[in-house]
């Protein structure tokens, strides 16, 4: 039985040699040089991220007020129509009601389109922030000759000096202090005012 096992090992070794000589050596792996970064903290705490969030909040608040004013106007129109229901002929009432419904539908459609445009503008601005942050991270990795960048969320324990998050935030604040939300002109009147 041992002879068969030894013959099998020799056969495997001969087969390996026939495919390229001696068994391949494992490639030399350089010792790890690790840096750790918290991208979520960067996207939350950097000046540019705070600036984008402030712009988003201001524009959303302003637009919400405009929509609320328009909704109040529509409610007043609807109440007036209900009061006139008994006075107006059925045809006139139905025409006014259709006009009211079209105004209501237009407002609803406009609100949805504007919210989508505003969300897209926010996403575009934050993508620019994230891409700039990733470039800074790559630059820091090159400066420190790091061959492994790990997100802080994946780390349970770290030695002091490996986390570069604050350095990335500092460089991002210098390189990209603000990004304007680029909301299309037709997306909503109040959204385009900074």
Task: Give a label for each model feature.
Residues 159:
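Catalytic domains of cell-wall/extracellular-matrix polysaccharide-remodeling enzymes
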Residues 27-153, 178-194:
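Amphipathic alpha-helical segments
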Residues 173-176:
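Acidic/polar surface patches and capping/hinge elements
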Residues 3-10:
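Sec-dependent signal peptide recognition
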Residues 10, 14-24:
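C-terminal segment of classical bacterial N-terminal signal peptides
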Residues 165:
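Short beta-strand-centered segments that line the small-molecule binding cleft or hinge
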